[in-house]
Each structure stands twice: as C-alpha cells, then as structure tokens.
Swiss-Prot record:
It is found in: Cytoplasm. Specifically methylates the N4 position of cytidine in position 1402 (C1402) of 16S rRNA. InterPro entries: RsmH, SAM-dep_MeTrfase_MraW_recog, SAM-dependent_MTases_sf. Belongs to the methyltransferase superfamily. RsmH family. Coiled coil: none annotated. It catalyses: cytidine(1402) in 16S rRNA + S-adenosyl-L-methionine = N(4)-methylcytidine(1402) in 16S rRNA + S-adenosyl-L-homocysteine + H(+). Its EC number is 2.1.1.199. It comes from Ectopseudomonas mendocina (strain ymp). SUPFAM superfamilies: Putative methyltransferase TM0872, insert domain, S-adenosyl-L-methionine-dependent methyltransferases. The gene is rsmH. This is Ribosomal RNA small subunit methyltransferase H.
Amino acid sequence: MTDSTLRHITVLLDEAVEGLAVRADGCYIDGTFGRGGHSRLILHKLGPGGRLLGFDKDPLAIATGEALAAEDGRFVVVQRSFAELGDEAVVRGISGQVSGVLLDLGVSSPQLDDPERGFSFLNDGPLDMRMNPDVGVSAADWIATAEEDEIARVLKDYGEERFAKRMARAVVQRREQQPFTRTADLAKVLTEANPAWEKGKNPATRAFQGIRIYVNNELGDLERGLDAALEALEVGGRLVVISFHSLEDRIVKQFMKRQAKGEADKLPRDLPIIPKAFEPRLKLIGKPVYAGDAELKANPRSRSAVMRIAEKLR
C-alpha cells in the first residue's frame, strides 16, 4: 500500500456537517467512517458532552477510527455495516436519542486506489471487491460459480449495463478455459464484450460497479440503514445521505419522499382526524445539494455526488 491509497478527499464535507445542524451536546452517528473526514469535523463542532459513533466494514478504516478514538474520548468506532446501526443504538442505549445520522455511500478513494482490494479496473489486483475482506464471497468466487443469467442480471440491475447479456456470455465462455482471479483480466474480457464505448468512461465501469454492489449487498444495506436511522433519530434529528449513482439516490429519494408524505391516503377520505401512525415522519430540508465548481476542480470524483437532508418529525 502506498501513501496515495491512504489519502481521501471527503466529498461535500462542509455541506454534510452543516446539514446535520450539529449541537454541542448532541449524539451523532457517522455510518460510513472511511478515513474520518466527516467525523473529525463533527467532533470539532461538538462540545465536551457530545458523542459520535462511527461505523465501517473496512478493516483499514477501523484502524484509522481506533486511532482517532484513542485521541478523543467522545468518539467510538465499530466494525459493522451501517445497516446494523439500529441494533448498535439499542445496545448502547441511544435508540431514539440520536441527533443526526450521516451516510456517505459508495467506495472511498483509498479502497479504489489500492489494487489489493480489487475494486478498480484501472490497476491490476486480486479480484475481491469486498468492503470487509474477511466476510462474504469475493467477486472471483461469485463469478466462478454464478449462472450466466445471474451475472447478466447483476450487470443490468446494479451496473445499469446495456450489454449485460453479451458481457455475461463472454465471462462464462472465458471462465470455462481459465478462472478469473485478477481485476485486469476481468476488465479486459468485459471491455472486449462492450461494442459501444462511452466517451470518457472505461467500458468496464458499469459492470465493475454492478459486481461490487452485488458482492457487498450495498442496496439492501442502504434500505435497512435508512429504516434503522429513522428509528434511531430523536424528534428533530437530521438524516444526511450522500449518494454517488442513480440506484442509491433513487432509494434515498423515494424513502425520504415516502416518509415525508405519510400514509394518510390509505385512510377513508371522510375521516375527521388522521391517526398519528399515518402522519409524516420526515420533513425534507432544502433541495438536493451538489458539489460546487471549486470542489469539482479539486476532486473530480465528487461530480456524481448528490446529498439529501431530512429531519425527523415523529
């Protein structure tokens, strides 16, 4: 690992922490600690009585978090998915008392830039793609056993790849001769199977995204994490989510919109009083936030980021 794989420019740093409306004595959750960019700014805004709980699946992120926890007693980090933040909040006695939850989705720069993690098609490395290399099935093992139809479905549904069937067929044909173990090898086969290259985008981009999302169950974790965050928040607490592709943002947008609408439309129209259980649970705060020109210039990876903010009503 090189120094470059340890560097990470936090996307929408100031905007996200501002969206949390941090109180000095509040209790906050950073569901995606990463290299601690957001967490450090939250801690800077917290007073002596404030608390911050960080989550991450990545062992290297946990090592960084433990070093920060050793420096600052207000911070604790746990090696769990943010999908499990509800359980952790119950264990720690803070369920329904959390002042804000931040989720910065996707893969961090250190993960992408470290060839040994197997996320990138630009640098050759073991074909892994797991956020936590000690848990679950690697990309190589999944590709070695998955049916052609399943591979095509994953590339189409999670990678939004137009040529999913063609790519899946090429992968299966090639693995019959030799198994895939390296990212460059898979990227080459996927690239050759893509007949319409998009300008400025590697032909393997969407396929790699789809496999990574599937291997890590990212969308399932997101759905669980949003539900858990809502329950963990106190009334008036903020939920801030940064997404990096349309699949994530669609889930976040629909969740917030649904919770902001409530379920009064399921009741008889002539009902004089709407029961509390059918009232909205969230209030949308402002419009979606995107990276500004200065951030886009400093960090091109921020170009696809979109941030949404909501506040708990009940």
